[in-house]
Design a protein with these regions (language model features):
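Conserved helicase RecA-like core
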Residues: 2-282
Length: 282
């Protein structure tokens, strides 16, 4: 099914999909968009990379179009700042021919004051991580009284990361809520709990992952000791002449320590873990 067949969607939104290079809808988009346009609660299971942002973005924008930028009409919750930023950018791209639409993205690791100014300037859509959204609500920078639509993206990951109470608290604040949609790669017990508590006759969408041939990846196991691990790792990188290497550690402390040790051996190293600020991550 092509996007141009969505007769209930504003031409400006369809024009944006064309400008973004989209013609044919993915399975999740074809199934979810009509349900959300009709205002159904929904649990959608679909693999990452299947176009879920467009699947919920088009209905959100369709409902928000025509409203002035003020108190938000829709909230999209994301488990991480990086995903929140990507969602906000995708929604902004979908709204490129709707100049009245404002999307504000709020997340931890960045200054509250700048985000508060953006919220107070007004918007129709807020994309947020749960903790930072609650921060702004407690500081009276965010009016949730007019939110009719809430979407939990990567709901399983978000709830498994410990945001269960925050998510419930946020939903409880939405007195004008008309629909709750959850998009998730898996349906965990926590996702089902949220659905049971807050959804009514929810539509269920299940998109199966495409079975692809296994990538050609060679796997090796090297037995070493704690004392020799650094030397063995360095020797492997040098002997194989690897140009790009990704190393995973089991703790944030070990990640930073290993990065420092490799840097002292004159490797060009970047370190990434959850305790880094947004500026350090960038």
């Amino acid at each position: 099914m092509q996007f141009t067949e969505l007769t209930r969607v504003a031409p400006e939104i369809l024009q944006a999909t064309q400008a973004m290079g989209f013609t044919e809808m993915t399975e999740i988009q074809e199934k979810a968009i009509p349900l959300m346009l009709d205002g159904h609660d929904m649990i959608a299971k679909a693999p990452t990379g299947t176009g879920k942002t467009v699947a919920f973005g088009i209905p959100i924008l369709q409902k928000a179009a025509g409203f002035p930028a003020g108190a938000p009409k829709a909230v999209v919750l994301s488990p991480t700042r990086e995903l929140a930023q990507q969602i906000a950018q995708d929604l902004t791209n979908l709204a490129q021919f709707l100049p009245e639409i404002r999307v504000v993205c709020v997340y931890g690791g960045a200054g509250l004051e700048k985000q508060q100014k953006q919220l107070k300037a007004g918007c129709q859509i807020v994309v947020a991580t749960p903790g930072r959204l609650m921060d702004h609500y407690r500081h009276h920078a965010l009016d949730l009284s007019q939110v009719t639509t809430i979407v939990l993206d990567e709901a399983d990951e978000m709830l498994n990361m410990g945001f269960y109470k925050d998510v419930r608290g946020i939903i409880d604040l939405l007195k004008s809520r008309e629909s709750l949609s959850m998009f998730s790669a898996t349906i965990s017990r926590e996702v089902l709990d949220i659905g049971w508590l807050y959804q009514h006759n929810a539509a269920e969408v299940d998109v199966q992952p495409v079975q692809e041939s296994s990538p050609k990846i060679a796997q090796y196991k090297l037995l070493t000791t704690g004392r020799d691990k650094l030397a063995d790792l360095a020797q492997i990188i040098i002997s194989k002449d690897y140009k790009r290497v990704m190393v995973f550690c089991n703790t944030k402390y070990n990640t930073g320590m290993l990065a420092n040790q490799l840097a002292r051996l004159h490797f060009n190293v970047d370190c990434l873990h959850g305790d880094l600020s947004q500026a350090e991550r960038n």
